[in-house]
């Protein structure tokens, strides 16, 4: 007893978490139920945590799990997995379970004796509500024999934390839970349920009202869903495992890579049902639809002009302020927008990626190429409503319209010019 007490007080023995303590295991059957995205997420989480624990000097030089993870093509399950299950009945009794968990129903199939360590707790056990049999689709009242049959099916999917006895249902959040046992967290939330490393992380108004329930332990940012929190936490690791095969740019999330690759492929899967315009990102389509409903909520206080989008409003204000925040490091020229600087940079690099399919001439931008191609088709789609004259480019039409303004006519008369359309 004295030895145990001494070990508990020894600071060198407290707060350590080994890689194997935060490793999630799957049986072959469970692994087979995961789709490609879920398997990729599992792989990312394991590799990131191996890197994190390694940086603390707490991981083995070569973990069996890490070796298995490097093989992307093989669906695997570690042969040395030895884990114990928790039945739903044990989970309902609360979090104060002692010792190892065991299957309560003796009729459980031997395959159900495999379970997995846990990550994320979900309160899904509501008293008095009927439980639905996930395999047969039947609903059972609490305590019925059919409900006991359901316990057999889910026995292998309920897990228990070996440190505090909490029971969980899912296998993708144990890292979040176990870290609470391994880090010093002196600042406790006023509700008494959570602790943080920094006092600035505590924001009980948002967390306990349900507005945001999942908080990042590094920066205190809160999220409504654990999946969004996991995506955010990759920012702090600095790991960017997803690399673009075309330009070499790396990303910390696979979905970010997919969006980026649409730049190279030209894929624009989101189409506006009103005008047929397509977009590569769904959020851009949502913003675009405001054009059709006539929403213009942003007003410039300098000139009274209205804008549909906040970013367009900000760019417009630079006309009044003269701000040109994007400067070319090569020649010092400044630009209002980042895209303007990017187009200018091609002057220095000589890059002309847009080629005319009719004559082979190349251009720095897609719009320049499209404008050039109109010369081949002799398309004149911009017509003056005053005189009916047609032009190939909208900019030429705008320049022409000045001829019809009273100021321009007065000026031409003063110089003895004859205005003709």
From Swiss-Prot:
Keywords: DNA-binding, Metal-binding, Nucleus, Repeat, Transcription, Transcription regulation, Zinc, Zinc-finger. Gene3D superfamilies: 6.10.140.140, Classic Zinc Finger. Its main location: nucleus. Residues 120-129, 404-415 have a biased composition (Basic and acidic residues). Pfam families: KRAB, zf-C2H2, zf-C2H2_4. One of its GO terms (biological process) is regulation of transcription by RNA polymerase II. Residues 120-146, 402-421 are annotated as: Disordered. GO terms for cellular component: nucleus. GO terms for molecular function: DNA-binding transcription factor activity, RNA polymerase II-specific; RNA polymerase II cis-regulatory region sequence-specific DNA binding; zinc ion binding. A zinc finger (C2H2-type) spans 159-181, 214-236, 242-264, 270-292, 298-320, 326-348, 354-376, 382-404. Disulfide bonds: none annotated. It is found in: Nucleus. PANTHER family: KRAB AND ZINC FINGER DOMAIN-CONTAINING, SIMILAR TO ZINC FINGER PROTEIN 84 (HPF2). May be involved in transcriptional regulation. Belongs to the krueppel C2H2-type zinc-finger protein family. This is Zinc finger protein 584. It comes from Homo sapiens.
């Amino acid at each position: 007893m004295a030895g145990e007490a001494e070990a508990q007080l020894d600071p060198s023995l407290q707060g350590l978490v080994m890689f194997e303590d935060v490793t999630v295991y799957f049986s072959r059957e469970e692994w087979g139920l995961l789709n490609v995205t879920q398997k990729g997420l599992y792989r990312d989480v394991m590799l990131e945590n191996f890197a994190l624990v390694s940086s603390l000097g707490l991981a083995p030089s070569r973990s069996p799990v890490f070796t298995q993870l490097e093989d992307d093509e093989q669906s695997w399950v570690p042969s040395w997995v030895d884990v114990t299950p928790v039945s739903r009945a044990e989970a309902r009794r609360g979090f104060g379970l002692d010792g190892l968990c065991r299957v309560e129903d003796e009729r459980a199939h031997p395959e159900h004796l495999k379970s997995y360590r846990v990550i994320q707790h979900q309160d899904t056990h509501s008293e008095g509500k009927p439980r639905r049999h996930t395999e047969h689709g039947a609903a059972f009242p609490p305590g019925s024999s059919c409900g006991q049959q359901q316990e057999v099916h889910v026995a292998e999917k309920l897990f228990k934390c070996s440190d505090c006895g909490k029971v969980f249902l899912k296998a993708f959040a144990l890292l979040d839970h176990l870290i609470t046992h391994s880090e010093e967290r002196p600042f406790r939330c006023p509700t008494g349920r959570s602790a943080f490393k920094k006092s600035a992380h505590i924001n009980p108004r948002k967390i306990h009202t349900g507005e945001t329930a999942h908080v990042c332990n590094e920066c205190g940012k809160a999220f409504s869903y654990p999946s969004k929190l996991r995506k955010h936490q990759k920012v702090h690791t600095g790991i960017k495992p997803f690399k673009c095969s075309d330009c070499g740019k790396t990303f910390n999330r696979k979905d970010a890579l997919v969006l980026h690759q649409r730049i190279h492929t030209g894929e624009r899967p989101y189409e506006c049902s009103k005008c047929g315009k397509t977009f590569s990102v769904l959020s851009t389509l949502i913003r675009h639809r405001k054009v059709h409903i006539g929403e213009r909520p942003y007003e410039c206080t300098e000139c009274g002009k209205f804008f549909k989008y906040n970013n367009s409003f900000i760019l417009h204000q630079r006309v009044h302020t003269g701000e040109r925040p994007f400067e070319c490091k090569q020649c010092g020229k400044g630009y209002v927008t980042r895209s303007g600087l990017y187009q200018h940079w091609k002057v220095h690099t000589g890059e002309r990626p847009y080629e005319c399919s009719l004559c082979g001439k190349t251009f720095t931008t897609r719009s320049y190429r499209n404008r050039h191609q109109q010369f081949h088709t002799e398309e004149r789609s911009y017509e003056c409503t005053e005189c009916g004259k047609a032009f190939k480019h909208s900019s030429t039409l705008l320049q022409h319209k000045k001829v019809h303004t009273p100021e321009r006519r007065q000026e031409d008369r003063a110089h003895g010019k004859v205005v003709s359309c």
